[in-house]
Amino acid sequence: MFPAAVGVLWQSGLRDPTPPGGPHGIEGLSLAFEKPSPVTALTQELRFATTMTGGVSLAIWMAGVTREINLLAQASQWRRLGGTFPTNSQLTNESAASLRLYAQLIDLLDMVVDVDILSGTSAGGINAALLASSRVTGSDLGGIRDLWLDLGALTELLRDPRDKKTPSLLYGDERIFAALAKRLPKLATGPFPPTTFPEAARTPSTTLYITTTLLAGETSRFTDSFGTLVQDVDLRGLFTFTETDLARPDTAPALALAARSSASFPLAFEPSFLPFTKGTAKKGEVPARPAMAPFTSLTRPHWVSDGGLLDNRPIGVLFKRIFDRPARRPVRRVLLFVVPSSGPAPDPMHEPPPDNVDEPLGLIDGLLKGLAAVTTQSIAADLRAIRAHQDCMEARTDAKLRLAELAATLRNGTRLLTPSLLTDYRTREATKQAQTLTSALLRRLSTCPPESGPATESLPKSWSAELTVGGDADKVCRQQITATILLSWSQPTAQPLPQSPAELARFGQPAYDLAKGCALTVIRAAFQLARSDADIAALAEVTEAIHRAWRPTASSDLSVLVRTMCSRPAIRQGSLENAADQLAADYLQQSTVPGDAWERLGAALVNAYPTLTQLAASASADSGAPTDSLLARDHVAAGQLETYLSYLGTYPGRADDSRDAPTMAWKLFDLATTQRAMLPADAEIEQGLELVQVSADTRSLLAPDWQTAQQKLTGMRLHHFGAFYKRSWRANDWMWGRLDGAGWLVHVLLDPRRVRWIVGERADTNGPQSGAQWFLGKLKELGAPDFPSPGYPLPAVGGGPAQHLTEDMLLDELGFLDDPAKPLPASIPWTALWLSQAWQQRVLEEELDGLANTVLDPQPGKLPDWSPTSSRTWATKVLAAHPGDAKYALLNENPIAGETFASDKGSPLMAHTVAKAAATAAGAAGSVRQLPSVLKPPLITLRTLTLSGYRVVSLTKGIARSTIIAGALLLVLGVAAAIQSVTVFGVTGLIAAGTGGLLVVLGTWQVSGRLLFALLSFSVVGAVLALATPVVREWLFGTQQQPGWVGTHAYWLGAQWWHPLVVVGLIALVAIMIAAATPGRR
């Protein structure tokens, strides 16, 4: 990552001393780059597996990142298609310029980019769904800015206080689900739709995973060491959409429902309902819900909530999907973990004060800190899990290498695999598969209703006994499935080890995937040593041959396999043990690998043997270079390749000999199964990848004062709901999402290994320029700005002196291009920091005026949101500034991100928001069915008062002076009516007086916080005095004929003399708790 002394993940930034667009501005860019060069076998394929996670209004920042990924993907599509840029493109000039820049950079680096696997959690699920849909349909996502600016308005998301039922504070189905269901099928077509591609490439491989949380879990079972039945309730839900699903227009409602179901933060949004096999019809503003059985492994309908409530990231299935993707050229795999912030970074210069026992946390502070801790720990757990996976992959790769090294020393004809090791492998793998199948089977059976008639969805009576308490269904199923798998994988006594391709094929897909992984490990070591175009092309051909040897069919989900098996009449009439046996047989049939696939796998390496031998022999023998240098890496890779080749044997490089390919196949089988026999049963497939966290905790050259998500994003406030409050706040977060996203993508694209390869192939090594100078020159041609004389100012680190980024620093960073003995860095952050300005200038040209307009005139025809004077002054300066340095520099002065709810306290928008939120919250509290009857009258009164107050605030448009006047008038008239003896007048007057008092308090709070508590005290006194009014007195204490509310609902109050004292004590306790919740007030 970018250098940082305080642990923050730095990232490329922006500043441009050149005129608008620089010498390579928008017009210059369009003239400089007409069409990309053709894609060849030497072109590198950069594949992004993108995981998005983050809550509620932080979705807007993630949407900005999504927009940049979408532009990069479209640029890659342009390079694959070739030709000139379409003249009928609907992109804005600035977006088209950004797309061209991405196309120029990947053309310079000779790569294409593929965003093929995506996953989303919580609000990240919405953006992941949009990005996945755009990939398959060729849509342009520029329009999601307006989608989020409109959809995210808090005053629109808040439920109407007049609703009869208020299950949450915000509309989930009526707003979020409805908007997504409407907009997903109508995304604007981009300049490179799939219809322009050849038939085979029209539906690019795409897999989308979206998580959710089940409110009523699905139960499976297992037994402990003593045979005791343990109920395992699984609350994790996972939606899966493939490219085939995403290409069908009728999938859009299911995709919208999945995204809405993941973004269902409790209390804020109501739970989402998932139909299973039968959808639900449209009801009011809620669209029709489709059946979700094809897209999830659930077994019945469910109410679900936010996907981020549990540690529910589909890491395992994501890695498996990565492994299954075939390749035809060199592939670099990167996992983009998109999260607005993983938490505040420790700053030794500003260490927070230690916790003090004499300063206890209040009720609200403790609650908010607890929620923040859960969120932060969840994100950190994800990153740790991925990092742990990487560490495990490295350890397993090392173990595989040492096994090959050991096997190479064995006597000729002695195999690495022994019968005992094969037995261990069979037992471990069969046990693992049996546990998975048993869990899926019992999960299905636990949700089946008792058998009543011929329905195939019910539980057969013959299975019921083993599923009751004290039954041994788990043990019976596991043992039977294990036995069936072991029988299928058994060897004849006379030949304890498999040798022919047909014998290897009996071990199914798990063994084949392991052997395929071993073959790819050999090729990865060879790629490190490749220097010429011919070597790269040869290795790319071998990689494609390995993937082409056998491509697994799209296997159905286990839940589908179980449901199909359980519906067969013959199975239902038999025993549960027979059902488990049939399930294992169906599973083995589904994972069958043909024998000739093993032969083709072996032949791929046999054909490549001369190339591999030549690469190992030509590597440098110098091992004294620094550990991370190119020479040292070549030395290590050569040693690994020689070890594998020594184990695999000697081959002429032709698969004509019928012995060569089968021999190579069983040697791969031996290496794979021996390694797996020594690993835990739950060991995953070895699939290495780079992990890059894309966050807002980054710095920039144009805005050096903005370094963290807490500083930049309004969505970090109010437990991540902040950006919903104001349109300008949403526009601010969207802009920062694009700025941050562009910088991160440039950083990832500038892979030092690829840059070194390009410089070695294209730079003139005999010319006057060094490789580093040649590459910097190419980046300047692309659009990177020239350096100012003192360099770009950088923020001071650790209280030290100010620093400047200079061209010499970049040349030093790129020194590895000319000296193979220098360490090869993991990334080149300073170069990316400087280059990313070319993109970020285009972003500012498109977004800065838009942000200013949301401050001054957020929506034409509507009253503007109130903003502080500093924000309005800044917005005016932005609109008046000419494009170029002066305008870009205004980003560092951006006051929008610095606005807070406190600074907006006196605004009409705040008054309207508070009034509506209070009325909605009162309605939500009154909608709780489990409320004791004694609490219902006070809540009804509270709802009446807050609803009346909201209506008056709507009429006064939230203006403080008008609100106070209206409140005072209602207060006077209400008191006059309340003291009358007529019941109707008394009740109406009391409500009017309460509403008036509430309005006076609200209006006064807008003007001055100092008067707030005085007015609240006045309101309390007024409430006490109201007890003397006839209406309240009779309502509470009744008359001779009627007992009143106290006599009906609180008769115990007068039953003993000390009961009223208890009530007074409880009131005092509440007051103490409120004081404890705000310990800062004295």
UniProtKB/Swiss-Prot annotation:
Its main location: membrane. It is found in: Cell membrane. SUPFAM superfamilies: FabD/lysophospholipase-like. The active site is at S122 (nucleophile), D306 (proton acceptor). A motif (GXSXG) lies at residues 120-124. Gene3D superfamilies: Cytosolic phospholipase A2 catalytic domain (3.40.1090.10). InterPro entries: Acyl_Trfase/lysoPLipase (IPR016035), DUF3376 (IPR024282), Patatin-related_protein (IPR019894), PNPLA_dom (IPR002641). GO terms for cellular component: plasma membrane. Keywords: Cell membrane, Hydrolase, Lipid degradation, Lipid metabolism, Membrane, Transmembrane, Transmembrane helix. One of its GO terms (biological process) is lipid catabolic process. It is a multi-pass membrane protein. Residues 50-319 form the PNPLA domain. A motif (DGA/G) lies at residues 306-308. PROSITE patterns: PNPLA. GO terms for molecular function: hydrolase activity. The chain crosses the membrane at residues 959-979, 982-1002, 1012-1032, 1057-1077. This is Uncharacterized membrane protein Rv3479. It comes from Mycobacterium tuberculosis (strain ATCC 25618 / H37Rv).
